[in-house]
Amino acid sequence: MIEQQAGSRIRVEALAIDGQEHAAQWAQRLGLPLHDADADFALQLTDDGLQLQQLGDDVPGAVRVDFVEGAVAHRRLFGGGTGQMIAKAVGIQPGIRPSVLDATAGLGKDAFVLASLGCEMSLIERQPIIAALLEDGLARGRGDRDIGPIIARMRLLTGNSIEIIRSWVEEPPQVIYLDPMFPHREKTALVKKEMRLFRPLVGDDMDAPALLAAALALATHRVVVKRPRKAPCIDGPKPGYALDGKSSRYDIYPRKALKPKAVEPAPDL
């Protein structure tokens, strides 16, 4: 059940004609009401999928996860491929596609980029509403002919990233990618819409140092932390180096070099 806090009360509602049953299922699963006249947000079932809408005057538009169309699809087609800074940050090179754990998945945009470039992705999202949006977007994407194979390389885990990482029992990821929530001051449209919408729900990631420490203990090859370009490093060990972009940078904490996988010889016939 989601703990309803002041300024972040949420109700579930169906906007699609036949969505009432589905809305009731989400409400039960998340422990949210279907009716709350004083709600600050509405998790809405629409014909185009699940979306989150802030209620009231002068609020940003609804946010949903869509890997098939829109900005994410455009980035997949025209974003620069392996030349993108995020690809360089996680260590993508010819013959190298590391396994990556995105421990701050959010809406899954960065994870989708890496999956589209061939990385096997695990995603962790701890905020249940954001995780629901992401789960819905992944489910819709699986049925698309073009991006279905990409979505197949993405699996979603819901819960506290630090706890999940500390109790990890599977083969460790080669790379752990972190993009902690940071107090943004930019006035871009993206910040106004998504950051304005999510900040009352998630706040800032005050446990980022503990998350970094857990990531460094699990990742076999490197940890990558995305930060606003002028933001300080996360408290803790200093990164080995950084890749700087126009508005953001990637702090790299290398452990050992990534190498191409050896190709096993074909069996004799």
Curated annotation (Swiss-Prot):
The keyword Cytoplasm applies. Pfam families: SAM_MT. GO terms for cellular component: cytoplasm. It is found in: Cytoplasm. Keywords: Cytoplasm, Methyltransferase, rRNA processing, S-adenosyl-L-methionine, Transferase. S-adenosyl-L-methionine binds at E125, R126, D179. GO terms for molecular function: rRNA (guanine-N2-)-methyltransferase activity. It comes from the Bacteria. It catalyses: guanosine(1516) in 16S rRNA + S-adenosyl-L-methionine = N(2)-methylguanosine(1516) in 16S rRNA + S-adenosyl-L-homocysteine + H(+). Its EC number is 2.1.1.242. Belongs to the methyltransferase superfamily. RsmJ family. Specifically methylates the guanosine in position 1516 of 16S rRNA. This is Ribosomal RNA small subunit methyltransferase J. The lineage of its organism: Bacteria, Pseudomonadati, Pseudomonadota, Gammaproteobacteria, Pseudomonadales. The gene is rsmJ.
